[in-house]
Design a protein with these regions (language model features):
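Conserved long alpha-helical elements within nucleotide-processing catalytic cores of c-di-GMP signaling
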Residues: 1-21, 28-55, 64-68, 72-73, ...
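Short, well-ordered beta-strand segments
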Residues: 23, 72, 118-120
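Residues immediately flanking
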Residues: 27, 77, 117
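PAS/PAC or PAS-like capping segment
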Residues: 27-28, 157
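Residue-level recognition of strand-loop junctions within catalytic nucleotide-signaling folds
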Residues: 35, 75-79, 101, 122-123
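Short conserved AdoMet
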Residues: 58
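Cyclic nucleotide signaling catalytic output domains
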Residues: 63, 91, 95-99, 105, ...
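Two-component histidine kinase transmitter core
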Residues: 77-80, 156-158
Length: 176
């Protein structure tokens, strides 16, 4: 269902000749919490993150869990020019990040995670949902490689990383 919504919203960007953005969020430090505190705590953390994401997204945007500790937000109707759309997408990413990295208290334990975000600006010309996710994923891994809690916007001139430089989880999801 998430992918159907994404397809519909991406088509709307093309119809309205307006830029949107696909944001791919990956939690920094989730695996460690899940491994050390257990899957129940990890599941609670994912539920809390999903709630925070839902509360902090703009009303016109859609959000969903892609899988594991990755989430997607599709921000639409950002602007009619690329520069302004990039600025707005970056501000949206930072706002989401601020809400997600707030500590979570569970049974007296303070859980702290980070969030790296890759952004694929959606031009008024249509690209496939799979390509948009793949390119947002590339930007997200660049953000993660530069530093935790990073935000990176994909640009088509960026070289695509080799399959060896992408973690096994991501390769499995993208079919590499």
């Amino acid at each position: 269902m998430l992918f159907e919504h994404l397809e519909h919203r991406l088509a709307a960007c093309e119809r309205h000749k307006n830029y949107g953005a696909l944001l791919l969020l990956d939690l920094d430090g989730f695996k460690e919490i899940n491994d050390t505190r257990g899957h129940d705590v990890g599941d609670l953390l994912l539920q809390t993150i999903a709630q925070r994401l839902e509360q902090s997204r703009r009303q016109e945007d859609i959000a969903g869990r892609l899988g594991g500790d990755e989430f997607i937000v599709l921000a639409q109707q950002l602007a009619s020019n690329q520069e302004l759309a990039e600025e707005k997408a970056f501000r949206i990413a930072r706002k989401l990040q601020e809400s997600l990295i707030e500590p979570i208290i569970y049974d007296g334990i303070k859980l702290q995670i980070g969030c790296s975000i890759g952004i694929r600006l959606m031009e008024p010309q249509r690209i496939s949902t799979a390509q948009a996710i793949r390119e947002a994923d590339i930007a997200m891994y660049r953000a993660k490689r530069n530093r935790n809690n990073g935000v990176q916007i994909f640009t088509p001139t960026q070289p695509v990383p080799s399959a060896d430089s992408i973690p096994i989880q991501a390769r499995a999801m993208s079919g590499l």
